[in-house]
Amino acid sequence: MAARPLITVHSDKGAASESNVTLPAVFRAPIRPDIVNFVHFELKKNGRQPYAVSQKAGHQTSAESWGTGRAVARIPRVRGGGTHRSGQGAFGNMCRGRRMFAPTKTWRRWHRRVNTTQRRHALVSAIAATGIPAVVMSKGHCIEQIPEVPLVVSDSVESIKKTKEAVVVLRRLKAWPDVEKVKNSRRFRAGKGKLRNRRAIQRRGPLIIYGTDNGISRAFRNIPGITLVNVNRLNLLSMAPGGHVGRFCIWTESAFKQLDNIYGTWKRPSAEKSHYNLPMPKMTNTDLSRLLKSDEIQNALREPKKDKARRLQKKNPLKNYRVMMRLNPFAGAQKAAAKAVEQRRLKEKQAKLDQKRGIATPVEGAGKGRPRKTTAKPTKAKAGKK
C-alpha cells in the first residue's frame, strides 16, 4: 500500500508546485484481487445484448419419418422427389439443415446482481492498487519517467479545451510514452469479431479522473487509450479493466481531495455512501521479512538445531560386503578360507575323474615337459562259480 503522507501537486507545465495534498485513506486499504476479479466478472455480464436463433430455424420444411421396416434411420425425412433434398433427414440436430440442439432463447438470465458492499470493496481495492508503482508497471504501463505515483495535477487541467494542449500536458508530465504504447499496440482482432464491426483492438492507456468538467473531456477524449471519468462516477470496469488491478491514473487536485469524503476513513464512515466503512487491513505491516526478523518474534523462537543427526540408509550386511566387513572384519578371512576349501575339493574331484578315465593329470610345480602318465592297475577277475 502507498505509505507516503503527502502527495505533491504538479502543474500543467509538468513542474512540481509548492502545494501538497494528504494521501487519502482509501490508498491504504487492503488490496483484494480475488474480490476485484469476481465483481468485474459479474458486472461485465450486465452489458451483454440478448441474442437467440429464430424459433422457426430448421423447421421450415415438411418432413415426416418413414417409420420402421425400411432399413433406414427413423429420423424425419423431407417429402417429395426430383431433388437431392428429398429423402434427406431433417429437424434433428445431427442432420444437415437442421435446428440446433437446445435453441438459444432471449429469456436467459443475462444480468447479475452483486452486493453493494462487495462492489464498493472491489472499487476501493482497485483504487489502492493504483498507488503502488510496482503493481502499475506489472500491468504494462510505461511510468518509468513519471515524477510520482499517484500522479496529481492542478485543477487548471480541467479547463483545457483543445486536444493539442492536452497532448502538451501529457508530454510535460512524462505520460506520453504510455499513449505511444497504446498507439503501437493497435492490431486486428483474432476471430470473427473482425466481421462484426470490431476489427481493431488496442491496449489501455491512462485513466484521467477529474472533479469538474470545464472542457477536459472534449480535450482528452480523442487521444488513444485515454479514459475520462468523474470522481463521483468511478466504476470498476474502468478502474480495473479485465479484472486486473493497477491501472495508471492521473488525478486532478479537486478530485483527489474528495476521496476521503466519498469513501471515508477508518475514523469516520463515508459521507456519500450510506452505511459504508472503509475495509480494515488484516495486517498493519505487510513486510513479512521485517516482521520475522523483529526482536519480538526472534525472542519467542528457539535457536535452530545445527547438530541434527541425519538419518542414514540402513543396508543389509548379508547382501552388502562392505557393511559386513565393517561389522565383522574376520568375515573376509572366513570367506577366503571357504573359497580355498571349495577350490581344493574341486581339484580332488577332477583328479579322481581323470584317473578313472585314464587321463594324465598335470603335477603342480613341474616344468613345462611332458606330463607324467599314470596308468590304472589291471584288476583281477574273481573266479566265479561255474
Swiss-Prot record:
Q: Where are stretches of biased composition, namely Basic and acidic residues?
A: 341-357
The region called Disordered is annotated at 341-386
Q: Which keywords appear in this protein's UniProt record, sorted alphabetically?
A: Ribonucleoprotein, Ribosomal protein
User: What segments bear the compositional bias annotation Basic residues?
Assistant: 369-386
Q: Which GO terms describe its biological process?
A: translation
Pfam families with a match to the protein in the record = Ribos_L4_asso_C, Ribosomal_L4
GO cellular component term of the entry, any: ribonucleoprotein complex
Q: Name one GO molecular function term.
A: structural constituent of ribosome
Q: Which family does it belong to?
A: Belongs to the universal ribosomal protein uL4 family.
> What is the designated name of this protein?
Large ribosomal subunit protein uL4
Lineage, opening ranks? Eukaryota, Metazoa, Spiralia, Lophotrochozoa, Annelida
The gene behind this protein is RPL4
